[in-house]
Amino acid sequence: MVERLGIAVEDRSPKLRKQAIRERFVLFKKNTERVEKYEYYAIRGQSIYINGRLSKLQSERYPKMIILLDIFCQPNPRNLFLRFKERIDGKSEWENNFTYAGNNIGCTKEMESDMIRIFNELDDEKRDV
C-alpha cells in the first residue's frame, strides 16, 4: 500500500534558497521544418544551466521550439527521465509509439499528450512514500 505525503512533501526534499541552482526538468518540441526522427528533447539539470542551454538551443538550432513541460524544483530530473524510459520499455502500447536516444524522444503527434501525461504522473510519484 502506498501512502501519500500530500503537502508535507515540500519538506521531504528541501528547496535550495537560490533558485538558480535548483534542479529542473524541461521537455520541449523542436518544431523544425524538416522531418526528424526525434521531435522532442529533454533537458535536465540546475536551473542556471537549463536557462543557458534553452537560450543557446533556441538561438542556434530550434528557433521555433515549444516548451511542453517545465518542472521547477524537480529533486532528481535524471531519475525522472530514466523512469520515463522504464515506463515505456517492454509495454507494447508505449514501446511501439515512443523512441529515444540520449535526451531525444520521438513519438507521433497523437501521442504527445500521453507523453506529457506520463512525465506528470512520474513527477507526482515524488509524493508517494
From Swiss-Prot:
Pfam families in the cross-refs: DUF3627 (PF12299)
Tree of life domain: Viruses
InterPro entries, alphabetized: DUF3627
Protein name: Uncharacterized protein 029R
Species for this entry: Invertebrate iridescent virus 6
